[in-house]
């Protein structure tokens, strides 16, 4: 087994007033040559957006972009004609492909929005852009690895143009579970939203990241 530990306090940080962002991988003005990507995982941003504020219209291409709200809502609008509110408990994905433009705003006047935005390099370049949003069954995450994303349109969760799988889990104290890799040769990146867990002997705390490869299962 090979592994790399990203402690929460080693992440990049930028506070723009309206946006307080922590970067697990190099992003914008924060660059760490040892923290550019983990496999196809390019961006893992932990964002807090102030009430009534947000990201103006901006472009993307050839990237799989996943948004997971943790608290509050996010209003989305894009050049494909999609307009939606992404709520806590939802997951949204955009395959940017040949190119899209979109904006994201906190629609609430008095509540902040917290979210993860995750970017993955695509398996195929210049695909037709697509959008998908679903509401998750939170109960499935209790003491279980609930799949929320995969490469398969027919599978549970949203799907993307990449051989990657996302799972969310909410474990009770002293609960133990084994995770088996989905595809030979893939690695796994574990990110702790809240609490303390032990993964293959490594203790992880809130907002720590842990990348593992050359292994068969996770305990």
Predicted feature locations:
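Short beta-strand segments
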Residues: 44-45, 69, 95, 119-121, ...
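Glycine- and acidic-residue-biased ligand/ion/polar-headgroup-sensing regions
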Residues: 61-80, 88-91, 174, 179-202, ...
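A short secondary-structure junction signal
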Residues: 103-105, 126-134, 157-161, 179-181
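Histidine-centered metal-chelating micro-motifs
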Residues: 54-56, 73-76, 92-93, 97-105, ...
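Short acidic-glycine-tyrosine-enriched beta hairpin
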Residues: 80-95, 138-141, 200-219
């Amino acid at each position: 087994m090979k592994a790399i530990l990203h402690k929460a306090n080693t992440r990049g940080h930028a506070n723009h007033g309206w946006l307080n962002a922590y970067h697990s991988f190099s992003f914008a003005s924060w660059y760490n040559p040892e923290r550019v990507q983990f496999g196809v995982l390019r961006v893992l941003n932990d964002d807090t957006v102030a009430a009534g504020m947000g990201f103006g219209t901006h472009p993307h291409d050839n990237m799989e972009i996943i948004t997971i709200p943790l608290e509050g809502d996010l209003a989305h609008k894009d050049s494909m004609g999609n307009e939606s509110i992404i709520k806590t408990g939802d997951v949204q994905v955009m395959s940017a492909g040949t190119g899209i433009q979109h904006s994201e705003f906190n629609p609430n006047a008095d509540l902040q929005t917290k979210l993860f935005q995750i970017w993955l390099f695509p398996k195929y370049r210049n695909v037709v852009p697509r959008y998908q949003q679903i509401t998750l069954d939170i109960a499935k995450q209790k003491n279980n690895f609930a799949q929320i994303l995969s490469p398969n349109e027919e599978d549970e969760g949203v799907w993307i143009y990449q051989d990657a799988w996302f799972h969310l889990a909410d474990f009770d104290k002293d609960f133990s579970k084994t995770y088996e890799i989905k595809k030979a040769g893939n690695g796994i990146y574990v990110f702790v939203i809240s609490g303390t867990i032990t993964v293959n002997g490594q203790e992880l705390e809130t907002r720590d990241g842990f990348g593992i490869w050359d292994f068969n299962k996770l305990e």
